[in-house]
């Protein structure tokens, strides 16, 4: 795992098309903004896991 330190307002790049910007820090919460092409799915981990679980429960699997 790559670990980076960023301050509020600073951005990191993921590949050529995805940017992640630190928007704010309040206590133990960090607000981030993600800019990505429409074809790149961006989800919180718990939402992604729910989507995968629902896919696994479909009759075609």
Curated annotation (Swiss-Prot):
Cellular component, GO annotation: cytosol
The family this protein is said to belong to: Belongs to the CsrA/RsmA family.
Pfam family, one: CsrA
GO BP terms: mRNA catabolic process; negative regulation of translational initiation; positive regulation of translational initiation; protein secretion by the type III secretion system; protein secretion by the type VI secretion system; quorum sensing; regulation of carbohydrate metabolic process; regulation of secondary metabolic process
Changes seen on gene knockout: Grows slightly more slowly; 30% reduction in staphylolytic activity, increased production of lectin PA-IL, blue-green pigment pyocyanine and HCN. Increases levels of autoinducers 3-oxo-C12-HSL (3-oxo-N-(tetrahydro-2-oxo-3-furanyl)-dodecanamide) and C4-HSL (N-butanoylhomoserine lactone) in early log phase which becomes nearly wild-type (3-oxo-C12-HSL) or 2-fold greater (C4-HSL) by late log phase. Loss of swarming mobility and rhamnolipid production, loss of sRNA RsmZ expression, decreased lipase, increases synthesis of pyocyanine and HCN.
Subcellular location: Cytoplasm
Protein name: Translational regulator CsrA
Organism for this UniProt entry: Pseudomonas aeruginosa (strain ATCC 15692 / DSM 22644 / CIP 104116 / JCM 14847 / LMG 12228 / 1C / PRS 101 / PAO1)
Subunit: Homodimer; the beta-strands of each monomer intercalate to form a hydrophobic core while the alpha-helices form wings that extend away from the core.
Biological role stated in the UniProt entry: A key translational regulator that binds mRNA to regulate translation initiation and/or mRNA stability. Mediates global changes in gene expression, shifting from rapid growth to stress survival by linking envelope stress, the stringent response and the catabolite repression systems. Usually binds in the 5'-UTR; binding at or near the Shine-Dalgarno sequence prevents ribosome-binding, repressing translation, binding elsewhere in the 5'-UTR can activate translation and/or stabilize the mRNA. Its function is antagonized by small RNA(s).
Highest rank taxon of the organism: Bacteria
Keywords: Activator, Cytoplasm, Repressor, RNA-binding, Translation regulation
Record-linked InterPro entries: CsrA, CsrA_sf
Designated gene of the protein: csrA
HAMAP family, sorted: CsrA
